[in-house]
């Protein structure tokens, strides 16, 4: 039995739910794993990696009647495709990025024994009620939908506030992430511009736009291309002025960058 078969069993009764389970505060318990590209920024990924890397070094332990078997599973190979280090790293990463991490049990064929644990990363999940019992219904990005009894899953969360089951989004970081993106874009644009515009030339007469473009290309080809190996630039009297643009290094606002870094590392 593969992991896909475990999460999407064909013979199990499909859970048909018409409405969400309503919590005491009337908040609909659902969450989505889209968080505005939080993991796609180098600074935030670095902070998350540092945390996840430290978590991956931990040694999980289990107490209770199932201790011997589950301890062996957790300490060596929680599931068929992950050892303990990878399992803990992925779990910590999911928790940092989405503030909610779901641990689903893997059962044997007759569902009498837990044979593994897997960190789920659905595109969205919701707590629903069916026959007076809570279920966790989840959907993956490929459209596959599954459901499991809520009391069989483990849920880790942080920034735990409105929802009785899931953590809050990372909306509190949106302003910092926007500043980080703006600074990165500004740095990239400045570097590209300083690397492409090297000379400014002024022609001493009115020229049609198409002729101006042709003259610019001719001037560049003659003086600025690899064909000119002499190091000497020559131009005729039609040019009133030719000036070299000094290429200056783009300097990052160190105070602003330090503030952004502090916000990111304090958050994570």
Where do the model's predicted regions map?
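Structured, contiguous alpha/beta core segments that scaffold functional sites
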Residues: 1-253, 257-259, 263-266
